A protein has these predicted regions:
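Catalytic active-site module of serine/aspartate enzymes centered on a nucleophile-bearing elbow/loop
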Residues: 249-288
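Active-site loop/turn elements of alpha/beta-hydrolase fold enzymes
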Residues: 61-63, 127, 258
Length: 288
């Protein structure tokens, strides 16, 4: 795949940076947008080379990477959705297929309602749709506690709590917050507070209002939305969110290899296989 072309687009309150990678040989496939929230484009660096048979667009959300946040107030899933729309509009490549990971798998839902013509097939991989969970009241308190911990004690203490939250299997008990705080060192984080409070996840996205999708409106949008889950993440909150979205839409969930970040491997997830993830993605898109 040739080197990407990198451009920017101005949106209300931010300047977004996006990349377009063209295939060496033009083919029949619809262009593919791959994005996360708040994960920046470089989080998909292991996946994108395995998608060289089609045009691939990636971008950094307004809170991440190379994008510039000019106004941090009023952040919401709907704001992120309009940003994604503006990126596709700027490329002139729509309609696009989409792989949306984690928070982006929530972002695509208001996007589908507002700009259905942008979208072909949408793979919504492990959306943390807290409002659809049976234990949503507990999870909302846990998310607020992580954000409050970040404000009070900084990155390491908050990330240790967040990681513990996202790897927990099954519904959260009412007394979960009564447990001792995790040691940041157990997760490879420093317990020292570096004084910064600009983390994209802990300082921005966790403070957004929860999003409750309208299943009737999404089904009527005409967008093919495929809720997806990781084969290795059964029982975790984002996996449960994917299953709940599938139930809401009346469709079967699609299983992908790996865990919540199955498109990238490393010391933290050596069994993830980006090539296998890409192969599954191509197969799902080509079933359309």
């Amino acid at each position: 795949m040739p080197a990407p072309t990198t451009r920017t687009v101005e949106v209300p309150g931010a300047v977004l940076t996006y990349d377009v990678r063209e295939p060496s040989t033009a083919g029949p496939h619809r262009p593919l947008l791959v994005f996360g929230s708040p994960m920046a484009a470089d989080g998909f660096a292991q996946l994108v080379p395995h998608l060289a048979d089609r045009t691939v667009v990636t971008f950094d959300p307004r809170v991440s990477g190379r994008s510039v946040l000019e106004d941090g107030t009023g952040l919401s899933f709907e704001v992120h959705a309009n940003d994604a729309h503006r990126v596709v509009e700027a490329t002139g490549l729509g309609p696009v297929d989409v792989l949306a990971s984690s928070g982006a798998a929530v972002v695509v839902l208001p996007w589908a309602l507002a700009h259905a013509d942008d979208l072909g097939t949408v793979v919504a991989h492990e959306p943390p749709l807290v409002d659809l969970l049976e234990d949503r009241d507990v999870v909302e308190r846990l998310m607020a506690d992580v954000a409050d911990t970040y404000d009070a004690r900084g990155h390491g203490a908050a990330m240790a709590k967040f990681v513990g939250l996202v790897v927990h299997e099954g519904p959260f008990p009412e007394d979960y917050l009564d447990r001792p705080d995790p040691d940041p060192a157990d997760f490879g984080f420093s317990a020292e507070d570096d004084g910064r409070r600009d983390d994209a996840l802990l300082g921005r996205n966790l403070r957004m209002p929860p999003y409750r999708p309208d299943g009737t409106a999404l089904r009527a949008s005409g967008v093919r939305i495929l809720p997806a889950v990781g084969a290795s993440s059964t029982g975790t909150m984002p996996h449960r969110g994917g299953l709940a979205l599938a139930t809401l839409l009346g469709v079967e969930p699609v299983t992908f290899p790996g865990d919540h970040g199955g498109f990238m491997a490393g010391d933290w997830a050596p069994d993830n296989d980006p090539a296998a993830f890409a192969a599954r993605l191509r197969a799902v898109l080509e079933e359309a």
